[in-house]
Amino acid sequence: YKNDLIVIKYGGNVLIDRNVFNNFITDLSVLNKLGLATVVIHGGGPRIKRELEKSNIQSKFIRGLRVTDKHIIDIVETVLIDFNDDIVNSLKDKGTEAISIHTKKNNIIKTIPEAKELGFVGIPNEINNEQILNVINQNKIPIISPLGLGKENQTYNINGDTAAMAVAKSLKSRRLLLMTNVDLSLIHI
């Protein structure tokens, strides 16, 4: 694995438990210190749900994807960026350098709309590999929020697993690890 990339998607449901979160941070720090090139894409569903409930907004889902209007995308973006910053700062506390990558800072994902009825839910259309590799070459861990920019720099929410698969495929990573509490079928990328 010395010169190989590993993409890790860590689900928001898994990271609710602070002990699990802290173990994840420790594991990432160890992998980085061992010289393994890792890219992390995180989820955030439970945190998004909590913030929407605080605003008395009921989520509607189609095919497992949250219907996302203009008001909801603003909340989703804020929650995912805050969570991203939490991961980066926790890694820094362990002495591991990481870089936030999201729609407001270092965006690497260009998107197209998934389906009109889903609103601002996108599908990755283009990944900026060069930017990710520049971070890795500095011995830092890129921490990527599942957000992308579409036409006119409109923010789109992306399913975390979909974002992780797109990044892994684009980078031709050796492994894609999906850390989740949801049963998944084996997916070939």
Task: Give residue ranges: language-model regions.
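Nucleotide/pyrophosphate-binding catalytic subdomain
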Residues: 1-187
